Regions:
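Short coil-to-beta transition motif at edge beta-strands of beta-rich domains
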Residues: 3-15
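Short aromatic-glycine-enriched beta-strand elements
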Residues: 35-39
Length: 62
């Protein structure tokens, strides 16, 4: 059985953006096309992005 790599509330970086930014995982979504999906939100934003697990990296603590 496979599990999500990231957890709700975890800080991640989204690697497909041109500007480096830290996002927070807001929801875990089911697997689609062989990959887990997530809702992520940037601080101060009002909408979530839906992204695949391969597009995320764990954010470094500052």
């Amino acid at each position: 059985m496979a599990f999500h790599k990231f957890k709700i509330g975890q800080r991640v970086t989204y690697r497909l953006t041109t500007t480096p930014a830290v996002y927070t995982v807001t929801a875990l979504l089911p697997e689609r096309a062989g990959e887990f999906k997530y809702h992520i939100r940037r601080s101060g934003a009002s909408i979530d992005l839906v992204v695949g697990e391969s597009e995320l990296r764990e954010a470094k603590n500052r």
